[in-house]
Amino acid sequence: MVISDLEKYYGKPYNNAYYEISNILQEFGFFRTQGSVYLNNNSDMANLMEAIQTLSEVEWFANSVRDIRGFRVEDWSNFTKLVKRKATN
């Protein structure tokens, strides 16, 4: 998101826009993993397209978005246990 555009089209406090984006994406099964990165266990690309279509209908979003991308994760590896086995606490 372009912050100056968010301030212009969404208003202040503009950071509430991120909460609204999250709520919309949750309707389609997305969950936030880090910052503005969202994942979904549903591999149906039509679901992704519907989410993007819904976001595009939000005027302040369409006017403020800097970059939006989608990709399919073919094989997801979780290395948390590998790292945590050396933890001291």
From Swiss-Prot:
Which Pfam families does this entry report, sorted A to Z? CRISPR_Cas2
Q: What class of enzyme is it?
A: hydrolase
Statement: the UniProt record of this protein carries the keyword Hydrolase = yes
Q: Does the keyword Membrane apply?
A: no
Return the InterPro entries for the record.
VapD, Virulence_VapD/CRISPR_Cas2
Gene Ontology molecular-function annotations: nuclease activity; RNA binding
What role does it play? Cleaves ssRNA, mostly between U:A.
The record's comment on protein family reads: Belongs to the VapD ribonuclease family.
* Record text on subunit structure and interactions: Homodimer.
Q: What is this protein called?
A: Endoribonuclease VapD 1
The source organism is: Riemerella anatipestifer (Moraxella anatipestifer)
